[in-house]
């Protein structure tokens, strides 16, 4: 018997896991295709405050807070050509979204928090 799906998501990283969770939460039958074996090393560990409301909607914000990732309150930009940098830019000064900080995450641990979430909803189908 061939199983059918409402959606096939290519990639199980943060974007793929987020889409899969949103779809599964809406009672869609989801298949996630990922060629890599988890946990895995991957770049992309610097989150921005805009991502925090998404994690709240997905129901993983508390798990992310509890994981103990480094809090990040802003950024500093460096120019290798001129050898100079900017003054620190605080998220609370630059963004007006009610989230003055974000996290610097270890991707293998971060992915491990996200991937099981869509499976939880999928298993409730």
Language model features with spans:
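Beta1/beta-strand and adjacent pyrophosphate-binding region of the FAD-binding site
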Residues: 1-15, 31
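Conserved N-terminal helical subregion
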Residues: 4, 77-125
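Glycine-rich FAD pyrophosphate-binding loop
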Residues: 8, 24-43
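Glycine-rich Rossmann-fold phosphate-binding loop(s) that bind the pyrophosphate
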Residues: 11-13, 35, 107
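Conserved Rossmann-like nucleotide-cofactor binding loop
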Residues: 15, 19, 38
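Short, well-ordered alpha-helices that flank and scaffold nucleotide-derived cofactor binding pockets
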Residues: 21, 25, 53, 116, ...
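Short phosphate-binding/catalytic loops that engage adenosine nucleotides
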Residues: 28, 60, 123
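N-terminal FAD cofactor-binding segment of flavoenzymes
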Residues: 40-82
């Amino acid at each position: 018997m061939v199983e059918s799906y409402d959606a096939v998501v290519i990639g199980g990283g943060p974007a793929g896991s987020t889409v899969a969770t949103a779809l599964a939460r809406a009672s869609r039958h989801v298949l996630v295709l990922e060629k890599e074996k988890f946990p895995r090393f991957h770049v992309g560990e610097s989150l921005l405050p805009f991502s925090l409301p998404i994690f709240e909607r997905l129901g993983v914000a508390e798990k992310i807070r509890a994981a103990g990732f480094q809090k990040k309150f802003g950024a500093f930009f460096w120019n290798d050509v001129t050898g100079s940098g900017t003054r620190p830019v605080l998220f609370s000064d630059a963004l007006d979204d009610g989230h003055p900080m974000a996290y610097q995450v270890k991707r293998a641990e971060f992915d491990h928090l996200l991937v099981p979430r869509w499976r939880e909803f999928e298993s409730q189908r």
